[in-house]
Amino acid sequence: YGPKGIGALFIRKGVDLKTIINGGGQELNLRPGTENISGIAGFGLAISKACNNINNNMLYLKNLENTFIKKLNQNKIEHVLHIKDRLPGVLTIGFPGTDGQSLLIALDLKGIAVSFGSACSSGTTKASQILLDSGINKDLAKSTLRISFGKIHKSEDVEYVAEELSNIINRLKK
């Protein structure tokens, strides 16, 4: 909800961060280049607005998640929610016995944008190494999608996605 190309990094005390881009001495020698002042200002405003309503926003996103999962359950769609401690509104969810890439393509044809695997592995057809390293077996990792909801979504949107996803899974399993 803020400008692209800008962000913040919280570094836990005691963590030794190494630079990955060499150059000038800006940002404590961690990232070279002139700071994007307008991006920083926009990011600050976005954070301020998000924090003003953080509890309401989190509750809204959790309600959307619950609506989505409830609809999958009503449709008797087997699923595995991978990450318990996560950002509200972002589901990493596996559908055993279903190919995640096929799901992604079929959903895309319906105008529904999701991602395959984890954020670290988007753009690849291989099982996400992050999911594998967290103990998820390869077959389940290959059936995993990342689905995100935001404040622009309504309950009807989430129900539509769950219904279309259910229809696609049932069709693929025939």
Give the ranges of each region predicted by the language model.
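Pyridoxal 5′-phosphate
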Residues: Y1-K174
